[in-house]
UniProtKB/Swiss-Prot annotation:
Xref: Pfam families: WRW
Record gene name: ATPsynF
Protein purpose: Mitochondrial membrane ATP synthase (F(1)F(0) ATP synthase or Complex V) produces ATP from ADP in the presence of a proton gradient across the membrane which is generated by electron transport complexes of the respiratory chain. F-type ATPases consist of two structural domains, F(1) - containing the extramembraneous catalytic core and F(0) - containing the membrane proton channel, linked together by a central stalk and a peripheral stalk. During catalysis, ATP synthesis in the catalytic domain of F(1) is coupled via a rotary mechanism of the central stalk subunits to proton translocation.
Principal subcellular localization: mitochondrion
Signal peptide as annotated in the record: none
Protein species of origin: Drosophila melanogaster (Fruit fly)
UniProt KW keywords: ATP synthesis, CF(0), Hydrogen ion transport, Ion transport, Membrane, Mitochondrion, Transport
Location(s), subcellular: Mitochondrion membrane
Protein's UniProt name: Putative ATP synthase subunit f, mitochondrial
Keyword hit for Endoplasmic reticulum: no
Amino acid sequence: MAFGDYPAEYNPKVHGPYDPARFYGKADVPFGQVKLGEIGAWLGRRNKTPNAVAGAVSRAWWRWQHKYVFPKRAGIAPFFQLTVASMTFFYLINYTKLKHHRNYKYH
């Protein structure tokens, strides 16, 4: 699959218009319905390649956009969510520099 192609599992005659937020692979048991003894087998069935992880992140991004950004009367919530997420991300990547400041008596 090249960059910009549809997934191999997508069939326009069966699935209709393409939706980037939908997984077109074989359906599996949702994680919320997995029993404790089956978690290892469930994780073993996951596709852990970089392409699969990138596809999962892309689908999550599209689902978030469909829920918060694309509605006709979208509010200000997505902007606050992106702001908090970016603040958290930059705090985490700068934590190694910031953790030394808590021991300083005077700045």
